[in-house]
């Protein structure tokens, strides 16, 4: 393993994530949401920063995920809050695809 591979962990199989969809998964004890948008893959924490709800149960509209509990909206690229009641941004994670594996870096 070279230095470029440090910190990367498997999040899901690429075939499990459909374009325009969100997939919730557990990675090393972290709840992660994976998104496939415009042939790119993004990763954020899967728990809304306003109240405990899985974003993977919400609605994905382009690059925006809406929380199913109180309709807070976040930009999946940056994690930025777009609409209240959330006031805290989501944590985002670097993503890469290696073969059929989606990998994220947690550090």
What is each PLM-predicted segment?
Residues 48, 67-70:
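Short cysteine clusters
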Residues 1-62, 75-76, 89-107:
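N-terminal pre-ligand scaffold of iron-sulfur
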Residues 62-68, 81-90:
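Short cysteine/histidine-rich metal-coordination sites, predominantly Zn2+-binding motifs
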């Amino acid at each position: 393993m070279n230095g470029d591979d440090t910190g990367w962990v498997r999040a899901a199989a690429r075939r499990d994530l459909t374009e325009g969809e969100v997939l919730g998964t557990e990675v090393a004890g972290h709840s992660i949401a994976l998104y496939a948008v415009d042939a790119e893959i993004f990763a954020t924490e899967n728990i809304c920063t306003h109240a405990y709800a899985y974003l993977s149960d919400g609605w994905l509209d382009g690059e925006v995920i809406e929380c199913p509990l109180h309709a807070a909206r976040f930009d999946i690229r940056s994690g930025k809050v777009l609409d209240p009641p959330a006031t805290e941004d989501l944590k985002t994670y670097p993503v890469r695809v290696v073969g059929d594996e989606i990998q994220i870096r947690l550090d």
